[in-house]
Amino acid sequence: MAKKQDCNLSCSECSVRNCYRKDKTFPAFCLTEQYPDALERTRKFYASNTTDGKLARAAAEIEGEYYGRLTRLEESIRFAKKLGVKKLGIASCIGLLDEASLYAKIVRTAGIETKTVICKVGAVDKTQLGIPDGLKVCPGCNEACCNPALQAQILNEWGSELNVLVGLCVGHDAIFTRHSKAPATTFIVKDRVLGHNPAAALYTAKFYYKRILDEKTFPEPRKEAVEAELAAAKPAKTTAKKPAAAKPTKKPAVKKVAK
């Protein structure tokens, strides 16, 4: 095994890719040769009857059976059936509810029960999280925050055996997977600009979309949003009230006694 290299080189800098076919030589910084203990641990639990082992084998079997022949939609259903899933949870963005509804219908056609929970469940206004009203997409309106933790907890209580994410926001998907008791996989990745195809930014990064390679050309946030953030960060001004002047006490009138 190679010794761990004191550098930041990793798989993204490798052009050998010997880990796939093992018909070449591993580079000096190869992670495969630098973590023997972790490698042995993962190899053991993939071969075991644990949840990770079942997931790994099901995914590998589907790859071998249908490589290049199934859409991701079809593959997710084959994956669920191979695992013996009876109850499949769907955590959807409200903006992709039509797509989630059609996906649920197709899954049910395959004989699997579904339950869909949209991101705005709970209807908690963003201001209740401490978000300034000016940072809403529509300031002045009731604007519910996404609630991925509640989505996960509802599906947990329902007893889902596999959860599928449909267009959850960046970050909200991370919260959902942290709270989901069942394994979670993704069907649609949200990209509001590129029609939910985030890889398109990489396909055009060297020419049409080259701004992503230069931090200086990154779009500025909305002016109204910045102003709202600044206003929220300023401490509230308090004007000290002057103490009220003490009222003069009247001396009691002295009655004159007649001599």
Question: What is each model feature region?
Answer:
Residues G84-S92, T116-K120, L162-V166:
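Short glycine-rich or small-residue beta-strand-to-loop segments that form or flank ligand, phosphate
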Residues R222-K259:
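Intrinsically disordered, polybasic Lys/Arg-rich low-complexity tracts
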Residues E99-I106, D173-A182:
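Short Gly/Thr/Asp-enriched flexible loops that form oxyanion-binding sites at enzyme active sites
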Residues D98-P148:
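Long, charge-dense
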Residues Y66-L70, S92-A100, A123, V166-A174:
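Gly/Ser/Thr-rich loops at beta-strand to alpha-helix junctions
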